[in-house]
């Protein structure tokens, strides 16, 4: 079943009512992505405020979810609610979670498409609707109910019915010699009319069933896309309860921004959410009157944690990096200036020179730049950036002040927590150092040991990021980590483009990362996805300059030596066009790689593993990569 937006508060109050008796009644399963992290923090704040005991368990994939569910919930009679954050809506949860009649399962997930069994079967599974189920899926709703109706399902037995009819005809013929000729004629005529009518009914039912099946297949085969930020959904819950505050508002802003910078936000949902959050910022953070301004700078006080609307540059971490590095490592600027080439870097230098900025000045940390130059930077960019294809270099965003310590933008925090999820506070990949292989260990035993160590490391990273959300010192340290990651992405991307290592196949482009100093970084799906987005945007912009409007999607693979597998990510071209063009009825552009990966898995003998909550991520045995790519090249990906 699904929960309408107007019923969010009622759904939460049921949790509160069930927790009166005490005990740990709520279990949270949280995907390892930034939006789910922010949503978990916000929901945990709500639950703590109502003194509701709960457990938080990050999960890395479907197998981990299934195993955690069995371990934590079997023989645990206290649990009354399971809440899934950014995981679960795309699969039939009855196949993954322990079924208990007195346990309600809440699914709050931005991944699409929904598994229709979760939202239409009346059981203990409740999917939070961001509006698309109620508003956009009426045709799907009617088709699902009709397809699964008892009346149409009877048609499946039509073949056996026909056989029985033929048997009756044989019986009729066997008694003809004992009947009068008049009786025989009437009997045959009556039976013929009934048979014709029955067959017509069966044919009509079969036709309707095929029509409904086609509608349902079309829904699933469109590929994967994204709905509203789940942090925004939970902020709506807090607002309905009258519990919203600045901390929750900031989490909602960061959650939305995370989707935007990872190309997972549709124009439809982003504009709607931005408008609502903008109103909340103005309501909860009124501008101080002139005679009320105290403190040293712009009305700041040591305890000021206000949120402000502010125009931002599409330069990564510009407040904390040098202006030059921020522009050089920005995907937006880099793709349009072609910074992977010497000519592209010269274009960047010319742009800075036209704005009156020397390279020496630009390579200083931004906060140490000349104040007059910083004041004129916005007007200079508006004047000169369009000549270099940077038409949208300035966009509306939010910042938060942390007393006299620092000011962070929503994108700063998004990059920071994303880096923590990928690498943790230590900034190293622990499993590459700690997983040793003994001589008597089989391949399967070592693989299991490595995957367990990897999952434990990712869980540790999750808690590092979770704690950093309310610790500005940890966030500032994580900014350095985000810079390190972005340098690795740009460095690797430039290498692939310079070597012309991105090959064009029948229906997609393909790139392979199987060596290099940064290979270990791309063992994490989130890091490899960022790398894929950077390369795809660079190629698409290059083609757009030559007038090509239809671009091929990109498949990027990174070799994981310990597993002897390739981690593979499929990036759709719509990831970049959806924010510029009008969205379709389903919001964000569709990525068909999940559907294609599943089809390849079903039709080949290649050893593949689809365990990630992102449908466009898959693992392939090293020896099967060629078979996998050959089969994939015949699939429709656009």
UniProtKB/Swiss-Prot annotation:
Cystine bridges: none
Keywords, ordered alphabetically: Cell cycle, DNA replication, Nucleus
GO CC, any one term: chromatin
A single GO molecular function term of this UniProt record: chromatin binding
Gene Ontology biological process: DNA replication initiation; double-strand break repair via break-induced replication; mitotic DNA replication preinitiation complex assembly; mitotic intra-S DNA damage checkpoint signaling
Chain intervals with Basic and acidic residues compositional bias: 190-204
Compartment(s) where it occurs, according to its Swiss-Prot or TrEMBL record: Nucleus
Domain of life: Eukaryota
Primary localization class, coarse: nucleus
Compositionally biased residues, Acidic residues: 153-170
Region (Disordered): 151-204
Classification via Pfam families: CDC45
Keyword GTP-binding: no
Role played: Required for initiation of chromosomal DNA replication. May have a role in regulating the MCM proteins nda1 and nda4.
Family, similarity comment: Belongs to the CDC45 family.
Subunit structure, as described in the record: Interacts with sld3.
Record's protein name: Cell division control protein 45 homolog
């Amino acid at each position: 079943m699904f929960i309408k937006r107007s019923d969010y508060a009622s759904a939460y109050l049921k949790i509160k009512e069930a927790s009166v008796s005490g005990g740990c009644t709520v279990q949270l399963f949280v995907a390892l992505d930034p939006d789910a992290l922010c949503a978990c923090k916000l929901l945990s704040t709500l639950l703590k405020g109502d003194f509701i005991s709960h457990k938080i368990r990050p999960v890395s994939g479907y197998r981990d979810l299934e195993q955690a569910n069995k371990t934590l919930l079997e023989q645990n009679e206290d649990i009354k609610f399971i809440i899934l954050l950014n995981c679960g809506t795309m699969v039939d949860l009855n196949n993954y979670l322990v079924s208990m009649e007195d346990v309600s399962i809440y699914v709050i997930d931005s991944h699409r498409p929904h598994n229709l069994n979760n939202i239409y079967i009346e059981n203990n599974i409740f999917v939070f609707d961001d509006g698309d189920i109620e508003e956009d899926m009426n045709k799907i709703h009617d088709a699902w109910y009709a397809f699964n109706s008892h009346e149409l399902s009877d048609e499946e037995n039509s073949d056996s019915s026909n056989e029985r009819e033929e048997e009756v005809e044989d019986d009729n013929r066997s008694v003809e010699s004992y009947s009068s000729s008049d009786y025989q004629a009437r009997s045959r005529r009556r039976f013929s009319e009934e048979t014709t009518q029955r067959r017509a009914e069966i044919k009509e039912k079969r036709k309707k069933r095929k029509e409904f099946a086609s509608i349902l297949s079309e829904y699933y085969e469109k590929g994967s896309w994204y709905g509203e930020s789940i942090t925004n959904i939970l902020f709506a819950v807090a607002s309905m309860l009258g519990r919203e505050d600045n901390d929750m508002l900031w989490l909602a802003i960061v959650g939305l921004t995370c989707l935007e910078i990872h190309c997972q936000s549709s124009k439809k949902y982003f504009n709607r959410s931005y408008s609502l959050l903008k109103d909340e910022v103005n309501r909860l953070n009124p501008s101080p009157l002139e005679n009320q301004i105290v403190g040293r700078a712009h009305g700041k006080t040591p305890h000021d944690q206000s949120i402000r609307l502010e125009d931002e540059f599409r330069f990564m971490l510009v407040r904390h990096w040098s202006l030059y590095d921020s522009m050089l490592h920005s995907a937006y600027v880099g793709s349009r200036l072609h910074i992977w080439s010497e000519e592209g870097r010269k274009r960047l230098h010319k742009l800075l020179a036209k704005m009156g900025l020397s390279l020496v000045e630009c390579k200083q940390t931004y906060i140490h730049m000349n104040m007059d130059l910083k004041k004129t930077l916005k007007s200079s960019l508006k004047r000169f950036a369009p000549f270099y294809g940077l038409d949208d270099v300035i966009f509306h965003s939010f910042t938060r002040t942390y007393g006299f310590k620092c000011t962070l933008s929503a994108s700063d925090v998004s990059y920071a927590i994303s880096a923590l999820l990928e690498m943790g506070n230590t900034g190293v990949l622990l499993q590459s150092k700690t997983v040793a292989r003994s001589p008597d260990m089989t391949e399967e035993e070592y693989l299991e040991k490595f995957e367990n160590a990897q999952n434990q490391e990712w869980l540790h990273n999750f808690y590092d990021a979770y704690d950093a959300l309310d610790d500005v010192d940890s966030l500032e340290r994580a900014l350095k980590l985000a810079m390190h990651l972005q340098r690795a992405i740009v460095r690797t991307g430039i290498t692939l483009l310079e070597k012309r290592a991105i090959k064009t196949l029948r229906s997609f482009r393909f790139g392979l990362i199987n060596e290099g100093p940064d290979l270990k970084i791309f063992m994490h799906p989130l890091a490899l996805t960022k790398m894929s987005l950077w390369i795809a945007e660079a190629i698409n912009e290059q083609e757009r300059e030559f007038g090509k409007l239809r671009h091929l999607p990109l498949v990027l693979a990174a070799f994981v030596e310990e597993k002897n597998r390739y981690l593979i990510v499929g990036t759709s071209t719509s990831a970049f066009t959806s924010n510029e063009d009008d969205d379709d009825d389903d919001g964000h552009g569709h990525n068909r790689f999940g559907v294609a990966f599943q089809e390849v898995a079903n039709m080949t003998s290649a050893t593949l593993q689809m365990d990630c909550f992102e449908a466009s991520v898959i693992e392939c045995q090293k020896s099967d990569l060629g078979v996998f790519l050959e089969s994939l090249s015949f699939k429709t990906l656009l």
